Curated annotation (Swiss-Prot):
It is an enzyme of class 6 (ligase). Its EC number is 6.3.5.-. It comes from Loa loa. It holds the Pfam family GatC. Belongs to the GatC family. One of its GO terms (cellular component) is mitochondrion. Subunit of the heterotrimeric GatCAB amidotransferase (AdT) complex, composed of A, B and C subunits. GO terms for molecular function: ATP binding; glutaminyl-tRNA synthase (glutamine-hydrolyzing) activity. Residues 1-96 form a transit peptide. This is Glutamyl-tRNA(Gln) amidotransferase subunit C, mitochondrial. Residues 28-57 are annotated as: Disordered. The keyword Kinase does not apply. GO terms for biological process: glutaminyl-tRNAGln biosynthesis via transamidation; mitochondrial translation; regulation of translational fidelity. Allows the formation of correctly charged Gln-tRNA(Gln) through the transamidation of misacylated Glu-tRNA(Gln) in the mitochondria. The reaction takes place in the presence of glutamine and ATP through an activated gamma-phospho-Glu-tRNA(Gln).
């Protein structure tokens, strides 16, 4: 989940940065180069923060996380939300993902992989050396009467009453107010 959030943040940053810097000349004048001595491999870092083009007031708020919803998510993902911070992180990730709904993608072609145009030859499906039943069953971790035994399905987790839902909502409100204050202070300095 955290890696998904990082990928989304990087994608939004690249959208913001790419939209403002149309050419390499503009890119060089608005940023400083860092890293490689090769001009084509330079990494450009903006000289000042670039405000988000997404209007945060239009972003859909994440749902209220009730005990029933948290239990349902834990059962589906087989991940226990150990404390309030874990639920708050999930709430922030959902809010961040909701920003993607506001991005206008009209006229943008979908991403295609390079492998779509490369032929993938397959070998003929001719059986080689036949394996014995005992050799096949050696791959199983558990066998009963010469049959593979599959692992049990998702075992439901017990409900946990440790989470303080009011604290989660308060922390989310504090986080949003911090971001609003920070955004207002950045606007005042400009």
């Amino acid at each position: 989940m955290i890696s998904f959030q990082i990928i989304l943040q990087q994608r939004l940053r690249s959208l913001r940065f790419g939209k403002r810097c149309k050419s390499k000349r503009t890119l060089k004048s608005n940023s400083t180069a860092v890293g490689s001595s090769d001009e084509d491999d330079e990494i450009y870092v903006p000289k000042k923060p670039i405000p988000s083009p997404i209007d945060q007031s239009k972003v859909e708020e994440p749902p209220v996380f009730t005990k029933a919803l948290i239990t349902h998510l834990e059962r589906l993902s087989l991940v226990r939300f150990s404390d309030e911070q874990a639920v708050l992180n999930l709430k922030q990730a959902v809010r961040f993902a909701n920003q993607l709904k506001l991005i206008d993608t009209t006229g943008i072609k979908p991403l295609e992989t390079l492998l779509e145009d490369i032929p993938c030859p397959l070998r003929e499906d001719v059986p080689g050396d036949p394996m014995t039943k005992a050799e096949v069953l050696m791959n199983a971790t558990k066998v009963v009467e010469d049959y593979f035994v599959t692992p049990p399905g998702n075992i439901p987790l017990e409900e946990s009453d440790k989470l303080d839902l009011m604290k989660i909502e308060d922390d989310a409100q504090k986080e949003m107010s911090k971001k609003t204050l920070l955004k207002d202070s950045v606007k005042k300095t400009e």
